[in-house]
């Protein structure tokens, strides 16, 4: 029998196989691929905060079972999620500004300065230059609280295998003007790192 030709069911005595039968997936499901930065919201990009929770509710109501995201690490030179600087660290762009405001780590005025442009587009260069200093302010304000926060201390202990190295790398990267590591001239992390 020609492999490209199927015999009619009447000739074989059995029903033809479904063209895409797959026994590895016992039930059908659907999902969506969308990076959280593409979610609509008040911030400069979508976050893993309220926008993400609303999105999950919407896709669940539509019958979707899966939300696949691109890598969520801190992006490097070009802001591609596929060129993340770490497989463990999170992308600071995905922090929920409203949550930082609710925790009194950023003021309403500081958050308003970071809002998305009126045309809905994101300028990642502007975002980097504005968000990074704002997050440093939030980190300074929250430092005392975090040093006494059991969940944070547990996280630090559990993630010690990569967290210290990431902090040193980040401090060196900043000290070297955010250039590529092969261009670095400073090889000692600043003391405040």
Model-assigned labels for residue ranges:
Residues 4-27:
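N-terminal carbohydrate-binding accessory modules
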